[in-house]
Amino acid sequence: NFQKNAKFILIDFNGEYAIENDNDNIIVEKALKSRFFLSTSKSDKDRFPIPESEINDLTFWSILLKATEQTQKPFLNSSLFKKTLVEHTKTENGIKALIYNTLSTILTQGSRNLDKDFHIFFLDELFKLNNSSSVFPNIKDVRNRLKSGLKTDYGNWILENIKHGEKPNEFLFKLKEIVQSLVIDLSKQNSFVKIRLQIIINYFDVITKGYYSKEHIGPLYNRLESKFNEITKVFAVTNEDKIIINKKPLIVVNLNDVNVEMKKIIPLVICKYYYEFFKKNNLDRENYLNIIVDEAHNIL
């Protein structure tokens, strides 16, 4: 019963409690434990499974991106839960509509304080997202067509010889036609990619409309790419909690090859999720969760 009802999660900062070979009998024999060797420097190592519900969580992203309470957290909240973003990023047509709306708003409604290449910065962010996910295979072609086709004449945008000031409907139709040529591979979009896309689109939307200033949310946004690359190396999204249903009593999470900043974040995410899971699903108090954080002063 002890083996069935007790769960031990050991956060191992320095690689003292698990070694990557079949003779790993540290603490208990290998058959009684699950081992995760996480790494922020290599992309072919283990990834710790966390459920989708944890990814769609404001606290998760606030911790990861170091969001400030007053301005950055509300921006993150709208990025995660705004209905149009959540629903439209599920489909190819929805994503194209979001991209078109963002571009048309930048080009036709953006304030004069916007960078003149703000639309290109937006496409560059989609290009970066594609580099790590392959969700937009021809984004470079679309970006180059818009970059070469758009010109300004005394503050008036011209797209492939169509002046917005003279023929606004034709201008927008041409813009939509170019956006429609974007190829979207939804099979490459996991929960991390979807949320990063929501944050990108929301950032350019709220800056263009003047709801937020770059000074307030820019620092958070600038952390997005590096944190996204790190988090996708160490966590895998699963719809079924493989750790909870796993009957092995000991889980060792080896953080020896994880950078200092992520060493602080990973234990917070793991501990928060499993503590809340057991609190909610263990009302009869028959199961026991034991979280052991070795070298805990590293994150306290």
Where are these regions (language model features)?
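Short, flexible helix-coil linker/hinge segments at the edges of structured domains or between repeats
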Residues: 30-32, 40-43
